[in-house]
């Protein structure tokens, strides 16, 4: 877990300390197996307008995360903190061996302070012919929640999507979400996708009974 602080010079110096991190995230059992993608962000490099590439070990490089909420800054531990307005996060990327149809998608968000707007979370799938499918998650889950000493909450949120096979020959994806106001510190994000397996693997997948979910707890320091 990251403990972070940042000084904001406005009317005076304000110290923001966040005790955040993934606590009890929703981790798919199929992460790291064939026909899956995983991306994780824990140390951001751009607070506003720049691409943040996945930095967690075993992430692929097929996506980037950008904050379009002006006024945000990086904290000492590489969180994205917004002292003046909401965060507006857009994540976008491509598919391995595109076009590919995802079957399951799992998103985890860790933040402290002003909470993430759970109604703002959407996933879009695009093909090369201008078609677009934008859907809300089928499940939005508060995996961890406790009061934050400076106001607001410390939360780990999870969102899931399920898709029918051959819904769209997707070559690109995009995930959007925002916070409900100023003073949000975005600590970590993860995204998992499971795709239609290769024909030779379908019988094996059927024998195994498909995928499932497990949950873990990140050690708090």
Each model region followed by its residue ranges:
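Sec/Tat signal peptide C-region and signal peptidase I cleavage site
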Residues: 14-20
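A short beta-strand element within beta-rich, extracytoplasmic domains
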Residues: 99-114
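Short beta-strands within extracellular/lumenal beta-sheet-rich domains
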Residues: 76-101
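A short, hydrophobic C-terminal helix/tail in secreted or cell-surface proteins
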Residues: 198-216
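Short beta-strand-plus-loop segments that form exposed binding edges in beta-rich domains
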Residues: 174-183
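N-terminal targeting leaders for non-cytosolic proteins
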Residues: 21-83
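Short, surface-exposed beta-strand/strand-loop-strand elements in extracellular ectodomains
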Residues: 117-130
